[in-house]
A protein has these predicted regions:
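Long, contiguous binding/interaction regions
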Residues: 1-65, 96-120, 126-162
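Helix-adjacent hinge/juxtasegments
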Residues: 64-100
Length: 162
């Protein structure tokens, strides 16, 4: 698959930056923050196909926020080898935002590859309440990821066929 291979260190640095931005936005606005990135197995975290899927998820998210009259207070967007990311401070209750995000993750054809986290003003991530299913086999996604029972190439094929 085309793209730049990233290391675990790259991913940890990306995570640290994301948490720092989330905390800054919560401090600045005293409102919940939504972080959207992709759950992509393997060493390549972005390329043209993955970006297309990310953009589709972003469009769906923006449409849902608009439909529910949720004001976007601040947006940060990154497209780096470690992946595509969108971080937003939103003027709405965290639970309402999480409900919208979960609906998108569950209804979009590639929603199982979307990672839409909502962080409340207490800096705690809201839980989905239910486990996500693997986009390939339908089992609990966490189990598939931990056991690596499905080769990452199968996920890439799914992206190509989207």
């Amino acid at each position: 698959m085309n793209g730049i291979n990233v290391t675990i260190t790259d991913m940890m640095n990306c995570r640290d930056r994301r948490v720092s931005i989330q905390n800054e936005l919560i401090s600045k606005y005293d409102k919940p923050v939504l972080s959207f990135c992709m759950n992509i197995p393997g060493p390549v975290k972005t390329n043209e196909q993955i970006r297309k899927a990310f953009d589709s998820g972003k469009a769906e998210l923006l449409k849902a926020l608009s439909a529910h009259n949720i004001t976007i207070l601040h947006t940060e967007e990154f497209h780096e080898p470690s992946g595509d990311e969108l971080i937003m401070a939103l003027d709405a209750p965290a639970e309402d935002i999480k409900t919208l995000a979960t609906e998108i993750e569950e209804s979009h054809p590639l929603g199982r590859l979307f990672d839409m986290d909502v962080i409340g003003t207490d800096s705690m991530k809201l839980s989905r309440g239910t486990y996500r299913k693997c986009i390939i086999c339908g089992c609990q996604a966490q189990d598939c990821a931990r056991s690596r029972k499905i080769p990452w190439r199968n996920y890439r094929r799914r992206l190509r066929n989207y």
